[in-house]
Amino acid sequence: MRVSASVKKICRNCKIIRRKGVVRVICTDPRHKQRQG
């Protein structure tokens, strides 16, 4: 899980999702998981 100020899609499987006001990236590749914090 990478925590960064700006989250971007890395590959075409990445999806940007808002959960409880937190922007997240979920992907089939676990290294692409990100959270905006």
From Swiss-Prot:
The keyword Cell cycle does not apply. Keywords: Ribonucleoprotein, Ribosomal protein. One of its GO terms (molecular function) is structural constituent of ribosome. One of its GO terms (cellular component) is ribonucleoprotein complex. It comes from the Bacteria. GO terms for biological process: translation. Belongs to the bacterial ribosomal protein bL36 family. NCBIfam families: rpmJ_bact. This is Large ribosomal subunit protein bL36.
